[in-house]
UniProtKB/Swiss-Prot annotation:
GO CC, alphabetical: mitochondrial inner membrane
Binding site for [2Fe-2S] cluster: 61, 66, 69, 81
Cofactor(s) needed for function: [2Fe-2S] cluster; [3Fe-4S] cluster; [4Fe-4S] cluster
EC code: 1.3.5.1
Residues in 4Fe-4S ferredoxin-type domain copies: 141-171
Pathway assignment: Carbohydrate metabolism; tricarboxylic acid cycle; fumarate from succinate (eukaryal route): step 1/1
Lineage: Eukaryota, Discoba, Jakobida, Histionina, Histionidae
A Pfam family this chain is assigned to: Fer2_3
Annotated keywords: 2Fe-2S, 3Fe-4S, 4Fe-4S, Electron transport, Iron, Iron-sulfur, Membrane, Metal-binding, Mitochondrion, Mitochondrion inner membrane, Oxidoreductase, Transport, Tricarboxylic acid cycle
Protein name in UniProt: Succinate dehydrogenase [ubiquinone] iron-sulfur subunit
Binding-site positions, [3Fe-4S] cluster: 161, 208, 214
Length: 239
């Protein structure tokens, strides 16, 4: 017989259903942490399975590698699957990523974000028409990609950026710019000049004011602000 005392945590979750006339509101759920996994995503899944099947959110890998479960937890953009439940608190507040159109509950519309990602042409460019060999890199060139390729496109950084809040129709944002630099610095890519010329724009790149929210919030501990600064440096070297 389990006589362990309940350890109740309140989860206050943003709710909005476009199919109903209700305004957005907060629903509060009680969860016994003794029968719940350690991560916020565990609590959300438990709530959906046991209390409210209408609660809607994205999730997939549960390992911090897909970026699906990005949301704002206690004021910080992060991934719910790798965000530990703070057992020192009595409640946690969960909202969708800020300044985004919401599809339902904790699900933001990422259509514009993905369109911006597509615009930087995130694939290797080569001037050779026929390839019959691999593109080799030195160890040093390969190491230049560290801190870049790990980005999971969760949009936590971009949606934490005030410049992106106000100019998301023109400013590419820290996530997409970090991805752009990932290809600019890749020694195997042959489209560097073309990429830099595309980014040399007062809005696409230069809306970054080095606020550093992006670097602070990144759940993968990457540094988008540094990548953006290096893009600017590379542009100054164009002749």
């Amino acid at each position: 017989m389990n006589t362990k005392k309940e350890k109740i945590m309140l989860f206050k979750v943003y709710r909005w259903n476009p199919d109903k006339k209700e305004k957005p509101h907060i629903s509060t759920y009680s969860v016994d942490l003794n029968s719940c996994g350690p991560m916020v995503l565990d609590a959300l899944i438990k709530i959906k399975n046991e209390q409210d099947s209408t609660l809607t959110f994205r999730r997939s890998c549960r390992e911090g590698v897909c970026g699906s479960c990005a949301m704002n937890i206690d004021g910080t953009n992060t991934l719910a699957c790798i965000k530990s439940i703070d057992t020192n608190k009595k409640e946690m507040k969960i909202y969708p990523l800020p300044h985004m159109h919401i599809i339902k509950d904790l699900v933001p519309d990422l259509s514009n974000f993905y369109a911006q990602y597509k615009s930087i042409e995130p694939w290797m460019k080569t001037t050779e028409k026929k390839l019959d060999k691999e593109f080799y890199q030195s160890r040093n060139d390969r190491e230049k990609l560290d801190g870049l390729y790990e980005c999971v496109l969760c949009a936590c950084c971009s949606t934490s950026c005030p410049s992106y809040w106000w100019n998301s129709d023109k400013y590419l944002g820290p996530a997409v710019l970090l991805q752009a630099y990932r290809w600019i610095v890749d020694s195997r890519d042959q489209g560097t000049r073309e990429r830099l010329q595309y980014l040399e724009d007062p809005f696409k790149l230069y809306r970054c004011h080095t606020i550093l929210n992006c670097t602070k919030t990144c759940p993968k501990h990457l540094n988008p602000a540094q990548a953006i600064a290096k893009i600017k440096q590379n542009i100054t070297l164009l002749t």
